[in-house]
Amino acid sequence: MNKHQIGLNAGIVWHLLNNNERWTYCELKKASGLSDRDLDAAIGWLAREDKIDFDSLQGDMDCVFLSVNVFIG
């Protein structure tokens, strides 16, 4: 795995999240076809760039969704 591949995988995840819905990890994994390692790296990339947010559901399940960054100034 290299930075270029992680960036490509982050693009795959971003396009899935672009429908403005909340996705669970399992849903993202199934829809993206990425391995756990590749999906984790892609989510980490998007989180580091402040492109996504996380929302906790009941139990141990978290959802991932695109964050809206609006800067007025």
List each model region and its residues.
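Short, cationic-aromatic polyanion-contact patches
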Residues: 3-10, 56-73
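A local structural micro-motif
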Residues: 25, 37, 54-55
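Residue-level detection of the helix-turn-helix DNA-binding "recognition helix"
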Residues: 18, 44, 48
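Short amphipathic alpha-helical interface segments
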Residues: 5-31
